[in-house]
Amino acid sequence: MKKIISLGLLFLLTISVSAQEVYQKEVFISSRGDSLKYRLLRLEKEKAGKKYPLVLFLHGAGERGSDNEKQLVHGGQMFLNPVNREKYPAFVLMPQCPIDAYWAYTSRPVSFVPSDMPAGQEISPVFSSLKELLDVYLSMPQIDKDRVY
């Protein structure tokens, strides 16, 4: 019985590691010199001259960090599903927000009531880097600018 459990755990570990290998590890350096780690899932088969959607997957606060892996925890396997990859071919960007930052604000609001939201503030440095990264991918000829999700 212990051997069966051990083999099962080894199999699950292998699946998880192989998922991380399919997503290319990348680091984007912004015009301000900030770095933004991200993963890129490319198409299995890309047809010359065809445009494909771009999916930008922003994780929650629990996946922030610097390992360039935690952002794959929720959603990473879904995009690798062979049925999804064949039926919905797309480039998938999965950036990782640094542990000391948030995607939207430089400081987290006390509540999310509209009147408490910071209006007129500059976007956070990490979001600025994300915008630049997105612009790079939108300039690529194989990306359909009308299908960014």
Can you say where each PLM-predicted feature lies in the sequence?
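Sec-dependent N-terminal signal peptides
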Residues: 4-15
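Gly/Ser-rich "nucleophile elbow"/oxyanion-hole loop immediately N-terminal to the catalytic nucleophile
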Residues: 45-50, 104-149
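Active-site machinery of serine-nucleophile hydrolases
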Residues: 61-127
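Alpha/beta-hydrolase
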Residues: 56-58
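Short, well-ordered amphipathic alpha-helices
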Residues: 39-42, 72-80, 130-138
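A domain-start/cap signature at the N-terminus of enzymes
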Residues: 17-54, 90, 126-129
